[in-house]
């Protein structure tokens, strides 16, 4: 009985000297009075109850009255039942301060983001991810982080900040397993090693099911799932998802409108490590309970700020519609980490100006650019590295043997890096065969499985080469200056091996 409701609740309904028999009688008496609705059963997380916020911490529920966080019943007069489960972090009496919120932003900014506001956007995502059940539309983030970027440290630090408020999985986890673990809750979900999706057809199907779950979670859509007992089961996902991988598996336009895609560059020297360590040390005093207390106190303010930011972002053609709404939630979350009030118009202008100059609008990427990115981020057959990484090995290998091994791998998929006659280091070219069978297999399950050569010809910097020898065979294909793909390869041409 205590798992259904607290002892105080039963006492309120049945009097001081109630017995189990009294409770059973009360339950029988309630039968038929209300129709069961899955939406009335809520798991752990933040929730909106009329205009109030409810935080179900599993073993207890909390709300805010007169500006203070207090404990409340898990059975509401509105008919909502907040399920009991494992205990999540309780909100602490003293919430996280503005300075501590800035420390989170500073730590995330210590990573080498390709995007101008990468650290700020990730910090805002974490804030809105905590309140995912309280808001109507949820953003998701996909971080592309190759080896040497500090991804392992990032994931570890995020887990420490969130405690068991977040659910953590690896790419090998099934959609059903994730769905069952989420249950009726609204916890933030971390999914690492999503590059496993590129290994085989079965893995790709598994990740596609996970992506379907993420799509439904964006707006909290209800799914009807069959069971062995032939009884349909309703499931409603209301979590925000953070996915991490080496490459990017976002293909559908529907997915790109729901995700903010961020990229981390490799570390550059000892100084970057020291900067990150210093920033990490400042997180030591931030507990999950302090972070949750701040988000509870500011959830309603965040919703107001999100609407204000969204209105301004919607004026920008590339950010209109759903994208403006999701970015509004994220930026409002980032603002709430360091400010407790309503955002001002000049502060919104600072955000929107940065959005206009950033590289967040993945939908503006052309089909040819997406095709090239798919090739560079795919894994070489028989090797754990991506095509882009093998190209880097060829250009920057520490030894002639390493560069020769890289050349053999590239030859096998019809790709060659060469310097035209009379050219200098900065004029190196990338040749991609339009006829290679292994490259065709890599692109088999994409939109370009039989036409990648024609598609790549549409790149502004590309030209067609009717004959190029690769591994003693003649090939037709596309030639692209290495300089034109350096943003995808993410390396400094000034350090190129001669």
Annotate each language-model stretch with its function.
Residues 1-116, 249:
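Segments of Walker-type
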Residues 154-157, 209-217, 238, 254-258:
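Alpha-helical scaffold elements adjacent to nucleotide-binding pockets in ATP/GTP-utilizing enzyme cores
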Residues 4-7, 80-84, 197, 209, ...:
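DNA transaction DNA-binding modules
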Residues 234-237, 248, 252-356:
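Phosphate-sensing "switch" segment of ASCE/P-loop ATPases
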Residues 138-142, 188, 240:
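Residue-level preference for the first positions of well-ordered beta-strands
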Residues 182, 226-243:
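AAA+/SF3 P-loop NTPase mechanochemical coupling elements
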Residues 73-178, 183, 316-317, 324-327, ...:
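P-loop NTPase catalytic core of nucleic-acid-dependent motor ATPases
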Residues 178-229:
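Conserved nucleotide-sensing/catalytic segment adjacent to the nucleotide-binding pocket
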């Amino acid at each position: 009985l205590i798992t259904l409701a607290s002892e105080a609740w039963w006492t309120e309904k049945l009097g001081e000297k109630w017995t189990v028999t009294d409770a059973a009688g009360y339950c029988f008496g309630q039968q038929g009075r209300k129709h069961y609705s899955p939406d009335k059963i809520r798991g752990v997380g933040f929730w909106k109850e009329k205009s109030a916020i409810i935080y179900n911490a599993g073993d207890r529920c909390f709300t805010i009255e007169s500006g203070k966080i207090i404990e409340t019943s898990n059975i509401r007069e509105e008919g909502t039942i907040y399920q009991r489960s494992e205990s999540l972090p309780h909100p602490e009496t003293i919430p996280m301060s503005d300075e501590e919120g800035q420390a989170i932003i500073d730590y995330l900014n210590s990573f080498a983001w390709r995007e101008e506001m990468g650290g700020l956007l990730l910090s805002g995502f974490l804030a809105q991810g905590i309140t995912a059940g309280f808001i109507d539309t949820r953003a998701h983030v996909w971080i592309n982080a190759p080896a040497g970027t500090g991804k392992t440290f990032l994931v570890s630090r995020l887990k420490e900040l969130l405690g068991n408020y977040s659910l953590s999985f690896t790419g090998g986890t099934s959609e059903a397993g994730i769905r069952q673990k989420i249950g009726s809750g609204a916890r933030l979900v971390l999914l690492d090693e999503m590059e496993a999706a590129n290994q085989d057809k079965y893995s790709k199907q598994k990740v596609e099911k996970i992506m379907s779950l993420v799509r439904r979670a964006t707006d909290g859509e209800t799914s009807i799932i069959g069971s062995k007992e032939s009884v349909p089961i309703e499931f409603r996902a209301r979590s925000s998802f953070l996915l991490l991988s080496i490459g990017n598996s976002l293909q559908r336009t529907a997915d790109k409108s729901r995700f903010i895609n961020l990229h981390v560059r490799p570390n550059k020297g000892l100084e970057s490590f020291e900067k990150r360590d210093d920033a990490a040390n400042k997180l030591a005093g931030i507990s999950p309970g302090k972070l949750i207390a701040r988000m509870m106190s500011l959830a309603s303010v965040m919703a107001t700020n999100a609407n204000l930011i969204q209105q301004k972002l919607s004026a920008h053609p590339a950010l209109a519609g759903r994208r403006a709404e999701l970015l509004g939630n994220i930026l409002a979350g980032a603002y709430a980490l360091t400010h407790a009030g309503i955002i001002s118009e000049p502060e919104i202008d600072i955000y929107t100006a940065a959005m206009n100059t950033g590289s967040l609008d993945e939908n503006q990427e052309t089909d040819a650019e997406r095709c090239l990115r798919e090739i560079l981020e795919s894994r070489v057959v028989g090797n754990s590295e991506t095509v882009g990484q093998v190209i880097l090995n060829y250009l920057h290998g520490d030894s002639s043997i390493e560069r020769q091994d890289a050349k053999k791998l590239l030859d096998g998929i019809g790709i060659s890096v060469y310097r035209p006659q009379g050219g200098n280091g900065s004029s190196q070219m990338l040749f991609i065969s339009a006829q290679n069978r292994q490259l065709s297999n890599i692109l088999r399950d994409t939109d370009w499985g039989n036409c990648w050569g024609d598609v790549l010809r549409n790149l502004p910097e590309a030209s067609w080469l009717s004959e190029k020898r690769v591994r003693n065979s003649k090939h037709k294909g596309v030639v692209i200056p290495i300089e034109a793909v350096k943003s995808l390869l993410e390396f400094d041409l000034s350090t190129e091996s001669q």
